[in-house]
Amino acid sequence: MTPISQTPGLLAEAMVDLGAIEHNVRVLREHAGHAQLMAVVKADGYGHGATRVAQTALGAGAAELGVATVDEALALRADGITAPVLAWLHPPGIDFGPALLADVQVAVSSLRQLDELLHAVRRTGRTATVTVKVDTGLNRNGVGPAQFPAMLTALRQAMAEDAVRLRGLMSHMVYADKPDDSINDVQAQRFTAFLAQAREQGVRFEVAHLSNSSATMARPDLTFDLVRPGIAVYGLSPVPALGDMGLVPAMTVKCAVALVKSIRAGEGVSYGHTWIAPRDTNLALLPIGYADGVFRSLGGRLEVLINGRRCPGVGRICMDQFMVDLGPGPLDVAEGDEAILFGPGIRGEPTAQDWADLVGTIHYEVVTSPRGRITRTYREAENR
């Protein structure tokens, strides 16, 4: 990797290394074996930028893309993405017409959603490419066992009318980080039972997919025809207890030091003076805060990397700024120097997992949080 450097003119940035995305997709493809790979780019690519991630993932061998909503899929189409895209989370009363006209695949979780989709088929004259999402134990969206026979009947009728192309059967796993938990086996058995029931009723799906990131990496027996990794695409380990699993985190959040100042022992810092300097020391002001995704609960707990060394945050994190302690003595930090809040960790900087551990959350929330005055930038992929 090349050294990180601050982009001129930016207050702060979330730099996304597309080479890391490329690497991660190739690692996932190796684990997927014979199965195809659907890269999940919902929530604007987990905060990394859906379009650029999608382009990179497809170039690295992903066959399809997955998103939560039709609007997310349409945004990819507007940006020129022509690969298969599946959307699976829909509010009541949605107009599926734009999805059909843009060749977006639709996953339905209920007969009501299928009815709404068929209404759009009749209006537009376009055949719908349909996946059925079944509930195997997560108890969110998905067709349950009691409703599945009626769904199969409705699908047979729709196929007889050439209203739908039946593409897939999918479900979602309870555990994102425990590939060996017994509920995974229970879900696989239930999923297989759904497939068998469909075959008995003369309904055949082109593909079946259950595996999330952790199953893709650690449960080859759950592969089926397609794997559907999300967080691992972005280089964050789906099973932190197992280390990085060969993945490379793609996001680095950094900003410029806005101000350097000295204070005396006994002086307080930031709102409420929750930190009192125990000695004469030097401080650096960083010009982003909780409005930009730096969690307020990290106040007095986080560290940042400046000029190769970790500096602790002191005092409360404010809406648009916070302070770090540079320590006493001669200054080795100047205004304009780069401060890395989190990144892959290869330079000694904190990682997204470090932040998650500090505030009792998951790294998913950390990387989807940068916003406001943090500008997303990209490092293009290089030959690795």
Curated annotation (Swiss-Prot):
InterPro entries: Ala_racemase, Ala_racemase/Decarboxylase_C, Ala_racemase_C, Ala_racemase_N, Ala_racemase_pyridoxalP-BS, PLP-binding_barrel. Gene3D superfamilies: Alanine racemase (3.20.20.10), Lyase, Ornithine Decarboxylase, Chain A, domain 1 (2.40.37.10). Keywords: Isomerase, Pyridoxal phosphate. GO terms for biological process: D-alanine biosynthetic process; peptidoglycan biosynthetic process. It is an enzyme of class 5 (isomerase). The keyword Magnesium does not apply. The modification N6-(pyridoxal phosphate)lysine is found at K42. Its cofactor is pyridoxal 5'-phosphate. The active site is at K42, Y271. It catalyses: L-alanine = D-alanine. Its EC number is 5.1.1.1. Signal peptide: none annotated. Catalyzes the interconversion of L-alanine and D-alanine. D-alanine plays a key role in peptidoglycan cross-linking. Homodimer. Belongs to the alanine racemase family. This is Alanine racemase. It comes from Mycobacterium tuberculosis (strain ATCC 25618 / H37Rv). The gene is alr.
